[in-house]
């Protein structure tokens, strides 16, 4: 990272601790996580509490992105702008979101990984939240690159990497293994990171 061209990046790894769960398949685990009420409320509260422009990245539009957008949008202050960007949003609208964000200093963009993993550069971005599990190293680094493009007023950016520990005594859950892979990437890239464990209650 060349000095002065890129923001300083801090990574907060937020490990949500669930009661032990056994999942037959990766898909079963994903369904459990993206429909988990407390998990989604945690992401909503984090998005609303952060200062500056915040990008919330999700994987599945209807099942997760739309749910997060609704929760955030219903609970925001009147003067705060919230955008929902996904593959179904045409390029012109995506460009409009980029322009607005570069003018704003406190907007929230709920966006699919696919839309923002490549192509859109937002200079004035302060926070990124990984709301959906993603094991793809390239995708993660592209998402991080989004934050690192330095805006004129910005010195520091923060990535909130949310992961989930549903491990049993005998087995780690799938997405926790993916998180461990991401940590390896952060070490290789020499990013600053801190791991914080947060206790979640069971599913309601």
Show which residues each predicted segment covers.
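Hydrophobic/aromatic beta-strand patches that form the interior of the parallel beta-sheet core
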Residues: 12-14, 83, 129, 160, ...
């Amino acid at each position: 990272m060349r000095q002065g061209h890129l923001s300083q990046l801090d990574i907060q790894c937020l490990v949500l601790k669930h009661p032990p769960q056994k999942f037959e398949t990766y898909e079963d685990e994903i369904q459990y996580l993206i429909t988990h009420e407390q998990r989604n409320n945690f992401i909503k509260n984090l998005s609303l509490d952060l200062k500056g422009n915040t990008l919330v990245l999700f994987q599945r539009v209807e099942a997760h992105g739309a749910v997060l957008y609704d929760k955030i949008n219903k609970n925001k202050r009147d003067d705060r702008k919230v955008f929902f960007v996904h593959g179904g949003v045409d390029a012109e609208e995506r460009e409009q979101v980029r322009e607005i964000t570069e003018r704003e200093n406190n907007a929230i963009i709920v966006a699919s990984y696919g839309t923002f993993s490549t192509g859109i550069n937002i200079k004035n971005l302060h926070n990124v939240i990984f709301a959906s599990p993603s094991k793809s190293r390239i995708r993660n680094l592209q998402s991080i690159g989004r934050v690192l493009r330095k805006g004129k007023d910005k010195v520091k950016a923060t990535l909130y990497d949310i992961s989930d520990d549903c491990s049993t005594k005998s087995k780690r859950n799938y997405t926790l293994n993916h998180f461990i892979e991401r940590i390896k990437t952060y070490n290789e890239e020499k990013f600053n990171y801190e791991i914080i464990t947060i206790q979640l209650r069971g599913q309601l």
